[in-house]
Amino acid sequence: MFKVYKKEIEVAGKKISLETGKVARQADGAIIASCGETVILATVVGAKKVNPDMDYFPLSVNYQEKYYAGGKIPGGYFKREARPTESEQLISRLIDRPIRPLFPSEFKNEVQLLPTVISYDKDNQPDILAITASSAALAISGMPFMGPVGASRVGLVDGKYILNPSKAELENSTLDLVVAGTKDAVLMVESETSGLTEEVMLDAVKFGHEGFVPVIEMIEELAKECRKPEWTVEKKDLSEVKKKLEENFTEDLTKAFATIDKQDRSNQISEISDKAKQLFADDENYSDFNVNDELKNLEKKIVRTDILKNKKRIDGRGLADVRAIECEVGVLPRTHGSALFTRGETQAIVVTTLGTSDDEQRLESLDGQHRERFMLHYNFPPFSVGETGRIGTGRREVGHGKLAWRAINSSLPPKEEFPYTFRIVSEITESNGSSSMASVCGASLALMDAGVPIKEPVAGIAMGLIKEGDDFSVLSDILGDEDHLGDMDFKVAGTKDGITSLQMDIKITGITFEIMEQALKQAKEGRIHILGEMNKALSESRADVGEHTPKMEQITVDKKDIAAVIGKGGATIREIVEKSGAKLDVNDEGVVTVAAPDEESRNIAMQMIKDITAKAELNKIYSGKVMKIMEFGAFVNFLGKQDGLVHISELATKRVEKVTDIVKEGDEVKVKVIGFDRGKVKLSMKQAAE
């Protein structure tokens, strides 16, 4: 019934297998990929007809993790997998980015790629396996895919690179890097580090590339045995369109791309586009899409030639020049920390809000439930590029936010030193390239403005590349048009000492490690320059948090005292909250976190906790409250939880006939500790008064 094809290989001591022919046989390509007990089903289907109204390649990648894969039932009221989580969206992008450039530009059929986690062992992470499975599904589908691609994760533990580390190994790693590409070239890099040098990062990319070449060879062997017939892709002859556009619009486009202002340049190009369409309006052989495609090719030729031959960029800068930078902090009066970062025509208002552990984000995944202390949200409204459009969070916003998150994360202080929860929001108010890196710079400034003791300021820069044959130019701080018309988008963020985050997307094959080395070197120079400009606004964190920030402090109590702090049925902790106005959180290790609206509230709560957990000291005088009257003396509560006996002979210097002659229940009194008897405290009011 089934004609099954299967290939296996061992990579980094783990067996990876690819199988096809048994499941999802009506898809154009279907692969069951497994590593350990983690299993991915990747399917791909392409529309058999081209949509004539499509002027782009409609590839959709939807990665999904099924809860049953880890033996779980989804939480919440509806027991079904809901909309994609942030993690699923990020992995979908991770799969899409190395695959998309490997389809020919004339291929416009709709393609849907669905990698699904159907078994998960909590040790072998599914994202790398999902890229492998997706690549294999495309390789056997017959579609015009110029792959296959492979992928690796690289860790760094004790100075040694680890290929495809387990989840446990990754927890001890100073590097989490994902690299994907073909046998000959790297196409995508995504990483988070603790601040590593350019040399270490480049070697990690090389190590990862070498690691996935055997996987690509396995996919190629599988495809030789079971690849479906190749799809035919019609390539329309547009030489006549190209010729007429060059004759009529080369001069106009050259002038347009010499215009520095983005909006003016965009308006000029739009007018040229309208004229170009009008030129072919009566020719039924060519659609507006055909004209648009060739006009874009002409734009690309003009800009790229100017950069390669004349070393001249669109806005007149040199190849390594960074646009003018303006930084301001404290721009919003009621926020905890804020910054306005402007670099050329790219601008971000970035705001830091500090909260308590109650504000941590609760996440559910195949690994279980966990809490996230640091959140960074990136918003890209259409007005930032002078357009109208949809408002909301898409994959692009999620991806840019996570990139900035990775850049900042390693510089944040640990919870033990600074017990706040962080939420950073980057509002992009203008955009002409590199808005995610503007978010990194603004986030660093906003954190320092909020009084967060970050380890080092962080800055980011986006690099570009123009390459024709062996001739290439690396561009620093690219514009939107340079990104669109160039061959590489290479974002690097870090401190003055090292890289904290790196993201690279390459649109062509043949990018050498020499080019990557040049880009990293140039990026470091740009990053140091940007940090210098940021330091002019604020060079270090403010000494304390702002006026409107919750005042937080932590105190560690003996585990034996946790019950005393909480009290019977929570009575004591409720009393502290009522009297101080602060919020309290007590964990199992005895760490008590106090969050208060102001200093006075925090001080009251802290003093009450100290009183409750303090130990009685011999000969020390305390304030107390008479709790019970007996014939032989009075029991007094002091230090919040401690009881002691004042014997009738220790009530006063004179002889006392009745205890009630001196005190009654509820009286506030001063007492001195005069001894201990089998764990009981002996007190004296008489000696306290002397």
Curated annotation (Swiss-Prot):
Residues 550-609 form the KH domain. GO terms for biological process: mRNA catabolic process; RNA processing. Its main location: cytoplasm. Signal peptide: none annotated. One of its GO terms (cellular component) is cytosol. Its EC number is 2.7.7.8. SMART domains: KH, S1. It is found in: Cytoplasm. PANTHER family: POLYRIBONUCLEOTIDE NUCLEOTIDYLTRANSFERASE, POLYRIBONUCLEOTIDE NUCLEOTIDYLTRANSFERASE 1, MITOCHONDRIAL. Belongs to the polyribonucleotide nucleotidyltransferase family. This is Polyribonucleotide nucleotidyltransferase. It comes from Pelagibacter ubique (strain HTCC1062). The lineage of its organism: Bacteria, Pseudomonadati, Pseudomonadota, Alphaproteobacteria, Candidatus Pelagibacterales. The gene is pnp.
